[in-house]
Amino acid sequence: MAAIGVHLGCTSACVAVYKDGRADVVANDAGDRVTPAIVAYSKNEEVVGLAAKQSRIRNISNTVMKVKQILGRSSDDPQSRKYITESKCLVIEKNGKLLYEIDTGEEKKFVSPEDVARLIFSKMKETAHSVLGSDANDVVITVPFDFGEKQKSALGEAARAAGFNVLRLIHEPSAALLAYGIGQDSPTGKSNILVFKLGGTSLSISVMEVNSGIYRVLSTNTDNNIGGTHFTETLAQYLASEFQRSFRHDVRGNARAMMKLMNGADTAKHSLSTLGSANCFLDSLYEGQDFDCNVSRARFELLCSPLFNKCIEAIREVLEQSGFTADDINKVVLCGGSSRIPRLQQMIRDLFPAVELLNSIPPDEVIPIGAAIEAGILIGKESLSVEDALQIECSAKDILVKGVDESGANSFKVLFPSGTPLPARRQHTLQAPGSISSVCLELYESEGKNSAKVENKFAQVVLQDLDKKENGLRDILAVLTMKRDGSLHVTCTDQETGKCEAITIEVAS
């Protein structure tokens, strides 16, 4: 049987298939192995991928990009607010949901982020079917380690709406290790692996322990202010300054001209990973004036040196979190398209001079290949439960329970700190006045660091129809069990009457 692995990133998507014992990435109908995660809307059609990217200059207000950044998030989420400010396609709130407003001239329509993701998943399914046939729909989807339950759920729903049978979701660093066979090549050995992922909009670094074929995340960190787009923007700003120097026109305030410069900078950036220089020619950039500029790799490296330094500093921070030094790392895995940049690879080699740097698989294909391998494992062993097939993980975020302090203000108690090895079990006693007939236990995830932390509610358990007491308090015992696959089972029991309620929050599969 055949299976599929899909990685939907912020700027691109990629699909791999597992067949006859091996996993391979499938090229789309344009012949490209990676598809831009962009959807453009016109009067009569919805266009996905390269065609949408190429048309965005003339149809920018109806072109949706980076949908993954807003998927499953509410309007008051800090990341949503940042996205709404930066998006060229208008995002509004309607009936409590975020929607894209599409105006093609005849009428306005409103499109959900989940529906945009559905179209991208449909493109991935169509690409996979080109080599597997239409009967193959079993898929494993990758998710960032810091995705919350709502983001995972939205991603899974979009994939199912596209016609996929979602076997499960797998964390991106785990997929990267699977792609290189780490843990399978020496199942009895123990090693520490650093996974460096520099994607389109973010940098994610994880330190993972591999022991007897089992994966465990020791520490992880994501920085949404460093990504391939930031390198492109840096180069585009330089090109804008060169145009101004040559023609005395500042185009930084012209959205159309800057989009052209971004396209040119993106092409030049990719060329500079293999060439010493790249030519950037833009036809009629501004007021009919063509622009022709040559950029050397040395110039690009100088412009982006602050970003390179931030990447290396992020590695040092993750090592410190895990209590490791560079000498404790056995292998470094590179993934994400921007990890191709030669200067960045050299800086990582300098930091880990005695460590094997794994980059033989194209870095933007590593994660979907690992997902396809996981899908092959799952469908190949029908008697294997999803939990048993899953590499051991740790909790990605702090899991908290909401309470009230002595002053009456809301307070939060951390039950599962980020990084808790799974499986894990916690108990929490909730006290409530005996005079009320229902009690609600609210569960939250935290995002961000220190003063920037934000608590997001993702589940609740309600005990109803409790017998009222005139005096005193009632004790509600909550038992929370998080399995190896990240699913959470919660049981709340009234200690006096034995009445209980239970819920299970699945791992969005």
Curated annotation (Swiss-Prot):
PROSITE patterns: HSP70_3. SUPFAM superfamilies: Actin-like ATPase domain, Heat shock protein 70kD (HSP70), peptide-binding domain. Its main location: cytoplasm. GO terms for cellular component: cytoplasm; cytosol; nucleus; plasma membrane. GO terms for biological process: chaperone cofactor-dependent protein refolding; protein refolding. It is found in: Cytoplasm, Cytosol. InterPro entries: ATPase_NBD, Heat_shock_70_CS, HSP70_peptide-bd_sf, Hsp_70_fam, HSPA14_NBD. Pfam families: HSP70. One of its GO terms (molecular function) is heat shock protein binding. Transmembrane segments: none annotated. Keywords: ATP-binding, Chaperone, Cytoplasm, Nucleotide-binding. Component of the ribosome-associated complex (RAC), a complex involved in folding or maintaining nascent polypeptides in a folding-competent state. In the RAC complex, binds to the nascent polypeptide chain, while DNAJC2 stimulates its ATPase activity. Belongs to the heat shock protein 70 family. Component of ribosome-associated complex (RAC), a heterodimer composed of Hsp70/DnaK-type chaperone HSPA14 and Hsp40/DnaJ-type chaperone DNAJC2. This is Heat shock 70 kDa protein 14. The gene is HSPA14.
